[in-house]
UniProtKB/Swiss-Prot annotation:
It comes from Vibrio parahaemolyticus serotype O3:K6 (strain RIMD 2210633). Keywords: Ribonucleoprotein, Ribosomal protein, RNA-binding, rRNA-binding, tRNA-binding. Belongs to the universal ribosomal protein uL5 family. HAMAP family: Ribosomal_uL5_B (MF_01333_B). This is one of the proteins that bind and probably mediate the attachment of the 5S RNA into the large ribosomal subunit, where it forms part of the central protuberance. In the 70S ribosome it contacts protein S13 of the 30S subunit (bridge B1b), connecting the 2 subunits; this bridge is implicated in subunit movement. Contacts the P site tRNA; the 5S rRNA and some of its associated proteins might help stabilize positioning of ribosome-bound tRNAs. GO terms for cellular component: ribonucleoprotein complex; ribosome. InterPro entries: Ribosomal_uL5, Ribosomal_uL5_bac-type, Ribosomal_uL5_C, Ribosomal_uL5_CS, Ribosomal_uL5_dom_sf, Ribosomal_uL5_N. The gene is rplE. Part of the 50S ribosomal subunit; part of the 5S rRNA/L5/L18/L25 subcomplex. Contacts the 5S rRNA and the P site tRNA. Forms a bridge to the 30S subunit in the 70S ribosome. One of its GO terms (biological process) is translation. One of its GO terms (molecular function) is tRNA binding. This is Large ribosomal subunit protein uL5.
Amino acid sequence: MAKLHDYYKSSVVAELTKQFSYTSVMQVPRIEKITLNMGVGEAINDKKLLENAASDMATISGQKPLITKARKSVAGFKIREGYPIGCKVTLRGERMWDFLERLINIALPRVRDFRGVSAKSFDGRGNYSMGVREQIIFPEIDFDKVDRVRGLDITITTSAGTDEEGRALLAAFNFPFRK
């Protein structure tokens, strides 16, 4: 079992129960899933770019990504409905905890000029979204084999009802929020 999951069960639940005066352990917010999304707009011209992006995402997440297709045609971007334009992965369970641990302890500290992530990126319901500009911050990605530096979106979905509860949950995991 992931160390972060054990830490959640042993320390975080008790800490948040005390902080928010929950009457039941089931009221304590938990992380439900982590979604990784990579938009590859250039894939319209070159299908190989999307394959490489999907390969990078599979390496980062440990799971095969789903190829996302355009929902509607946009003439300005030369996109037709159904064109493959990105990929996404939804992590739950053991893989989710492993990814979160690697994100907090290894990947984010490797970002150049890292001062912390914004504490304002909550959606109003306790879910947190952030963007990473380079996929090479993850140690699984071999820098020499990367054809192009791509960014990805990371969404952490929690069962928290408010942003305050969601922020407290992530802060309990030592999530590096900007001061």
